[in-house]
Amino acid sequence: MTGIAELEKLRKEMASVTFEILRLCRRRNELAEKIAEIKMRLNLPVEDLSVEEDLKRRTLEICRSQDMDEDFCLKLLNLLIGESKRLQREKLKMKA
């Protein structure tokens, strides 16, 4: 396999992985909306810092075991948590 062919193959695989990540993000967003509905029924706030801290701890454990950059992992987690909170707040506003 030539260098160019190998490069193209790897780029194609990288694109595929990126698209799978986006599909998983969509699923995560769907779960956040369902969580918002339950929180609304139970009159619970959007934020639960103990849940966030536990997720952060578990995320760092996985990042370390996979030899990934912790800063990157935390930035990604914060982005995901921020989007979940945004969706939950939006859902709560719609029901108010």
Where are these regions (language model features)?
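Domain-level signature for soluble enzymes in the chorismate/prephenate branch of the shikimate pathway
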Residues: 1-96
